[in-house]
């Protein structure tokens, strides 16, 4: 991994205030982003921009992964659900933060991306990440309830199933909207959901029974 490039990117994110938590900084430093993108794109791996990974999907910009990890308030030992595996990069970063005592379940609907991300995550030794082929808008009841849930595609709203599979005290982070999208944070407290608008974003559409 080109250390100088990633140090430069992370330093820029810190100076802009995108990331502050040491756990997030360490995770972004540890995950080799170039392993999660097509070889033809490797020279762009540490440019802070979304990149195409095939099948009409993208790997999120480094700053967006960092922001989402910060806003999720991740911690060691948490049980986390990701809706939309894509390349597997985001799941790897979260895996680094929750550690061996935590677990990341990530759902991908596109078979080609499912196979590729599963292979890369396995080769890199992310044993606490389980990649599932399916409709992420339904959640994944088998490993519920979750302490944290995040969605990497924008839907018309957050599927009810995700709230049902969230632990009390848990957080959901999801982009909501079609052309104009807002990253929303939801927290479940004593069975009630409290929501907060964070920032304007641009994600691929959330496809599924409870998406677009």
UniProtKB/Swiss-Prot annotation:
NCBIfam families: pimt, PRK00312.1, PRK13942.1
Name of encoding gene: pcm
Active site: residue positions: 60
GO-annotated molecular function: protein-L-isoaspartate (D-aspartate) O-methyltransferase activity
Assigned EC number: 2.1.1.77
Protein name (database record): Protein-L-isoaspartate O-methyltransferase
Pfam families (alphabetical): PCMT (PF01135)
Subcellular location: Cytoplasm
Gene3D superfamilies xrefs: Vaccinia Virus protein VP39
Reaction it catalyzes: [protein]-L-isoaspartate + S-adenosyl-L-methionine = [protein]-L-isoaspartate alpha-methyl ester + S-adenosyl-L-homocysteine
Enzyme class: transferase
InterPro entries listed in its UniProt record: PCMT, SAM-dependent_MTases_sf
Function noted in UniProt: Catalyzes the methyl esterification of L-isoaspartyl residues in peptides and proteins that result from spontaneous decomposition of normal L-aspartyl and L-asparaginyl residues. It plays a role in the repair and/or degradation of damaged proteins.
């Amino acid at each position: 991994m080109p250390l100088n490039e990633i140090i430069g990117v992370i330093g820029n994110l810190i100076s802009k205030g995108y990331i502050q938590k040491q756990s997030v900084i360490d995770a972004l430093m540890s995950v080799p982003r170039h392993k999660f993108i097509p070889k033809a794109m490797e020279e762009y791996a540490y440019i802070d921009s979304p990149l195409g990974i095939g099948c009409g999907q993208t790997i999120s910009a480094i700053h967006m992964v960092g922001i989402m990890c910060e806003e999720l308030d991740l911690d060691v030992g948490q049980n986390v659900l990701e809706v939309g595996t894509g390349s597997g990069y985001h799941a790897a970063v979260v895996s680094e933060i929750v550690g061996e005592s935590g677990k990341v379940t990530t759902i991908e609907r596109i078979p080609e991306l499912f196979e590729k991300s599963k292979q890369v995550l396995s080769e890199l030794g992310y044993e606490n990440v389980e990649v599932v082929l399916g409709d992420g808008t339904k959640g994944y009841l088998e490993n519920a309830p979750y302490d944290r849930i995040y969605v990497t595609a924008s839907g018309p709203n957050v599927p009810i199933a995700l709230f049902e599979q969230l632990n009390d005290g848990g957080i959901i982070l999801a982009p909501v909207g079609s052309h104009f999208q807002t990253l929303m944070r939801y927290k479940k407290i004593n069975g009630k959901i409290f929501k907060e608008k964070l920032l304007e974003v641009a994600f691929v559409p959330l496809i599924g029974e409870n998406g677009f």
